[in-house]
Protein backbone atom coordinates (compact mmCIF):
# COMPACT_ATOMS: atom_id res chain seq x y z
CA UNK A 1 0.00 0.00 0.00
CA UNK A 2 1.34 3.39 -1.00
CA UNK A 3 -0.09 6.53 0.52
CA UNK A 4 -0.64 9.57 -1.69
CA UNK A 5 1.70 12.47 -1.00
CA UNK A 6 1.72 16.01 -2.43
CA UNK A 7 4.30 16.79 -5.10
CA UNK A 8 5.82 20.10 -6.17
CA UNK A 9 4.40 21.83 -9.22
CA UNK A 10 1.14 21.55 -11.08
CA UNK A 11 1.54 18.01 -12.32
CA UNK A 12 -1.74 16.27 -13.00
CA UNK A 13 -2.04 12.65 -14.02
CA UNK A 14 -5.06 10.45 -14.36
CA UNK A 15 -5.19 6.69 -13.86
CA UNK A 16 -8.11 4.28 -13.89
CA UNK A 17 -9.18 2.95 -10.52
CA UNK A 18 -11.98 1.55 -8.43
CA UNK A 19 -13.52 3.32 -5.45
CA UNK A 20 -15.09 0.97 -2.92
CA UNK A 21 -16.25 0.89 0.67
CA UNK A 22 -13.55 -0.17 3.11
CA UNK A 23 -16.09 -2.13 5.14
CA UNK A 24 -18.80 -4.33 3.64
CA UNK A 25 -20.85 -6.55 5.94
CA UNK A 26 -23.13 -9.45 5.04
CA UNK A 27 -25.82 -9.45 7.76
CA UNK A 28 -27.96 -12.43 8.72
CA UNK A 29 -30.15 -13.62 11.57
CA UNK A 30 -28.83 -15.70 14.48
CA UNK A 31 -31.82 -18.01 14.07
CA UNK A 32 -33.80 -19.52 11.20
CA UNK A 33 -37.30 -18.54 10.17
CA UNK A 34 -39.65 -16.85 7.74
CA UNK A 35 -39.10 -13.16 7.01
CA UNK A 36 -42.08 -11.27 8.41
CA UNK A 37 -40.93 -7.73 7.65
CA UNK A 38 -38.17 -5.94 5.73
CA UNK A 39 -37.78 -2.44 7.15
CA UNK A 40 -35.30 -1.10 4.58
CA UNK A 41 -34.87 -0.75 0.83
CA UNK A 42 -31.72 -0.97 -1.26
CA UNK A 43 -29.87 2.33 -1.13
CA UNK A 44 -31.31 3.36 2.26
CA UNK A 45 -28.98 5.00 4.77
CA UNK A 46 -29.41 3.41 8.18
CA UNK A 47 -28.02 4.20 11.59
CA UNK A 48 -26.28 1.86 14.00
CA UNK A 49 -28.87 -0.14 15.94
CA UNK A 50 -31.68 0.47 13.44
CA UNK A 51 -34.05 -2.45 12.74
CA UNK A 52 -33.39 -3.95 9.30
CA UNK A 53 -35.68 -6.99 9.24
CA UNK A 54 -37.82 -9.20 11.44
CA UNK A 55 -38.64 -12.92 11.36
CA UNK A 56 -41.99 -14.43 12.29
CA UNK A 57 -41.45 -15.18 15.98
CA UNK A 58 -44.79 -16.91 16.72
CA UNK A 59 -43.34 -20.38 17.39
CA UNK A 60 -40.42 -18.94 19.36
CA UNK A 61 -42.83 -16.88 21.51
CA UNK A 62 -44.88 -20.03 22.22
CA UNK A 63 -41.75 -21.93 23.26
CA UNK A 64 -40.79 -19.03 25.53
CA UNK A 65 -44.28 -18.90 27.10
CA UNK A 66 -44.23 -22.66 27.75
CA UNK A 67 -40.79 -22.47 29.36
CA UNK A 68 -41.83 -19.48 31.50
CA UNK A 69 -44.87 -21.44 32.70
CA UNK A 70 -42.74 -24.48 33.55
CA UNK A 71 -40.24 -22.26 35.37
CA UNK A 72 -42.96 -20.59 37.47
CA UNK A 73 -44.45 -23.98 38.35
CA UNK A 74 -41.09 -25.50 39.30
CA UNK A 75 -40.13 -22.38 41.29
CA UNK A 76 -43.32 -22.70 43.34
CA UNK A 77 -42.66 -26.40 43.81
CA UNK A 78 -39.08 -25.63 44.90
CA UNK A 79 -40.40 -23.44 47.72
CA UNK A 80 -42.29 -26.44 49.08
CA UNK A 81 -39.32 -28.79 48.50
CA UNK A 82 -36.98 -26.43 50.37
CA UNK A 83 -39.27 -26.59 53.40
CA UNK A 84 -39.49 -30.39 53.16
CA UNK A 85 -35.71 -30.64 52.79
CA UNK A 86 -35.19 -28.36 55.78
CA UNK A 87 -37.39 -30.73 57.84
CA UNK A 88 -35.56 -33.79 56.44
CA UNK A 89 -38.77 -35.07 54.80
CA UNK A 90 -37.06 -35.62 51.40
CA UNK A 91 -33.65 -37.00 50.62
CA UNK A 92 -30.71 -34.81 49.72
CA UNK A 93 -30.57 -36.57 46.36
CA UNK A 94 -34.19 -35.71 45.49
CA UNK A 95 -33.67 -32.11 46.58
CA UNK A 96 -30.45 -31.77 44.54
CA UNK A 97 -32.20 -33.20 41.47
CA UNK A 98 -34.95 -30.60 41.84
CA UNK A 99 -32.40 -27.77 42.23
CA UNK A 100 -30.52 -28.99 39.13
CA UNK A 101 -33.81 -29.23 37.21
CA UNK A 102 -34.66 -25.64 38.11
CA UNK A 103 -31.20 -24.46 37.01
CA UNK A 104 -31.53 -26.29 33.69
CA UNK A 105 -34.94 -24.74 33.15
CA UNK A 106 -33.52 -21.30 33.96
CA UNK A 107 -30.85 -21.79 31.26
CA UNK A 108 -33.50 -22.95 28.78
CA UNK A 109 -35.60 -19.89 29.61
CA UNK A 110 -32.66 -17.56 28.89
CA UNK A 111 -31.94 -19.43 25.65
CA UNK A 112 -35.56 -19.05 24.53
CA UNK A 113 -35.49 -15.32 25.34
CA UNK A 114 -32.33 -14.97 23.25
CA UNK A 115 -33.93 -16.82 20.34
CA UNK A 116 -36.91 -14.45 20.39
CA UNK A 117 -34.48 -11.50 20.37
CA UNK A 118 -32.55 -13.07 17.47
CA UNK A 119 -35.66 -12.78 15.27
CA UNK A 120 -34.84 -9.09 14.88
CA UNK A 121 -31.90 -7.99 12.72
CA UNK A 122 -30.32 -4.68 13.76
CA UNK A 123 -27.51 -2.80 12.05
CA UNK A 124 -24.11 -3.01 13.81
CA UNK A 125 -22.91 0.19 12.06
CA UNK A 126 -24.27 3.20 10.22
CA UNK A 127 -24.14 2.79 6.45
CA UNK A 128 -26.02 2.10 3.25
CA UNK A 129 -27.99 -1.00 2.28
CA UNK A 130 -26.17 -2.17 -0.84
CA UNK A 131 -28.27 -5.27 -1.50
CA UNK A 132 -31.25 -7.17 -0.11
CA UNK A 133 -30.95 -10.89 -0.81
CA UNK A 134 -34.41 -12.10 0.34
CA UNK A 135 -38.01 -10.96 0.21
CA UNK A 136 -40.84 -10.96 2.72
CA UNK A 137 -42.24 -14.46 3.45
CA UNK A 138 -39.06 -16.25 2.32
CA UNK A 139 -37.37 -18.73 4.66
CA UNK A 140 -33.80 -18.04 5.81
CA UNK A 141 -31.35 -20.22 7.67
CA UNK A 142 -29.20 -19.18 10.59
CA UNK A 143 -26.34 -16.97 9.42
CA UNK A 144 -27.53 -16.65 5.81
CA UNK A 145 -26.86 -13.13 4.49
CA UNK A 146 -30.14 -11.22 4.25
CA UNK A 147 -28.65 -7.81 3.40
CA UNK A 148 -25.30 -6.33 2.45
CA UNK A 149 -24.39 -3.19 4.37
CA UNK A 150 -21.55 -0.83 3.41
CA UNK A 151 -19.82 1.86 5.42
CA UNK A 152 -18.98 4.72 3.06
CA UNK A 153 -17.31 6.84 5.72
CA UNK A 154 -14.12 4.95 4.94
CA UNK A 155 -13.36 4.30 1.29
CA UNK A 156 -10.50 2.67 -0.56
CA UNK A 157 -9.24 3.52 -4.03
CA UNK A 158 -7.55 0.76 -5.99
CA UNK A 159 -5.49 1.73 -9.01
CA UNK A 160 -2.61 0.26 -10.93
CA UNK A 161 0.27 2.65 -11.59
CA UNK A 162 2.89 1.98 -14.24
CA UNK A 163 6.31 1.24 -12.71
CA UNK A 164 7.78 4.23 -14.55
CA UNK A 165 5.44 6.60 -12.68
CA UNK A 166 5.90 4.88 -9.34
CA UNK A 167 9.72 4.99 -9.53
CA UNK A 168 9.91 8.73 -10.35
CA UNK A 169 11.45 10.92 -7.67
Task: Please name every model-derived segment.
Residues 38-39, 44-74:
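Structured, soluble extracytoplasmic/luminal domains of envelope-associated proteins
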Residues 1-32:
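N-terminal beta-strand block that forms a small beta-sandwich/beta-barrel module immediately after a flexible targeting
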Residues 24, 37, 86-87, 118:
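Short basic coil micro-motifs at the edges of alpha-helical modules that engage polyanionic partners
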Residues 5, 28, 56, 122, ...:
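Residue-level detector of conserved, well-ordered beta-strand and adjacent loop positions
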Amino acid sequence: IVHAEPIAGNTFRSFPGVVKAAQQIELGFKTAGQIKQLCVDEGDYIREGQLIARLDDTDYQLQLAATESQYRQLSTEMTRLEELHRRNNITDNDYEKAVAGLEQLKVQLESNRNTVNYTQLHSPISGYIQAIHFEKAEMVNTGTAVVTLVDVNNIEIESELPASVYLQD
